[in-house]
Amino acid sequence: MAYFEDTIEHSRQLLFALEAGDAHEVEERAHAIKGASANICAGPVREAALQLERAGRNKDLSQTPQLYKVFKKEFQRLLEYLKSLPLPS
């Protein structure tokens, strides 16, 4: 599923942006994750990405380490849930 591959890549780039202190790139990557997550109705992942997007837009990265942890936790929860579903026949 393209969502997971794309979100993993955006997540990796988001982490690089956070480490570099690049607020604009944080906003861009989080925005992409937010939109893709909304498209598949992944509410908690979308909300976590929204918080990161806002931090980037406001150029206030002081809370982003914690926000990124929340995002990763919610994304991992989504992956685990989907892995638990039976495969279609």
Each language-model region and where it sits:
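Long, amphipathic alpha-helical coiled-coil segments characteristic
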Residues: 1-32, 39, 58, 62-87
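A broad "ordered helical/assembly scaffold" signature
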Residues: 34-36, 52
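Hydrophobic, amphipathic alpha-helical faces that serve as interaction scaffolds
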Residues: 48-57
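Amphipathic C-terminal alpha-helical segment
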Residues: 38-47
